[in-house]
Amino acid sequence: MSKVTLSKKTLDVLKNFSTINSSIVFRKGSTVRTISNAENILAKFTGEEIFPTDFAIYDLSQFLSGISLFNDPQLEFTTSDFVNIKGGRQSAKYYFSDPEITLKSAPERNVNFPGSDLQFNLSSDDLLALQKASAIYSLPDLTFFSEEGSDTI
């Protein structure tokens, strides 16, 4: 039996990943990847947790909400069918989905992009504000461009 305790940072990253794609396939190890259904957003995170096996979650937001019901939750992997979420005297079984029915799973290997023309830092608060504005105005994409020394989103 393997036990995993998700850090706050990992939970925050997974919450962000759930806005990119509602489904996710976790691969054995410490790296988690997601890709949008339109394949225009790809994200990768390496956390301190090591997942003992591959498993798929169909609704990542629901999974994270379930974890939030527990005090100091621990994920216990004892079977390939489900994970036990335990905290205090409470526990719940969360069944994995078939990886074949997840909406879109990220490639297992790294994607090599050509060199960058523009580099910048974007805080998580700014990204959340942009995502909120995008949702309010029903805009599916954000565009980043640079013109005469001015960077614009």
Task: Locate predicted features.
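DNA polymerase processivity clamps
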Residues: M1-S97, F113-I153
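Charge-dense, extended regions
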Residues: E100-T102
